[in-house]
């Protein structure tokens, strides 16, 4: 009986099962192997073998993890053994096929510090719905600390914005306290997800809330938005969240802006002989209020009398 053969989804050739790497993905459960043969993966790797991003792209496409320490180990192993010389990818695939790694996927990747930060930055840029730059992401990491997951950064920033929208944050000390409150709340969330006790973390949170006067029983200190004056709110929104352009109907409801443009700037432009937007608006407004001499009507009356 002939050995089982699998058709490669890349080159289209039918090859023996031993020409494919093991896979525990549910999408490959019928064969227990990757759908791409070893030769095709090797060819893709050789196109840019010195570029670590190329390796990561290959592993991401086949949903296998990139573990930085294992990759370094594979490089050293392939250099020290003549049999596997140059076949770094093959050595690495052998290593992640071991018991501790064979069920892991791309989501379980472990980068070195710089690689991990770059990966997190790119994910944050991709997930952001606002016009945000790489510099903004760097500031975000500086503010919250490096080494967190993408979802943690997003949750922390949203929580911080929520706090600063509800309470006045006009000093460095208050900013640091709210920062620590958000980090402590994140720690509590994660510990609860893992079924761990959070008594100590809750005490820390209560102390931080007390230090910042944000406890519900406290009526002084950092007051809620409903207790802030209108001027304070305007200042806050202008400094932290610029007010967007109003709708046309709210831009100049009392026509004061129009009067200034037409009867001051427009009239001044006319006096100086300038042709610009204001002078055009001036003449347009003047034409509305100009009375034309009814020459035609008087001529008609004279003709009727004669």
Swiss-Prot record:
It comes from the Bacteria. This is SPbeta prophage-derived uncharacterized protein YonG. The gene is yonG.
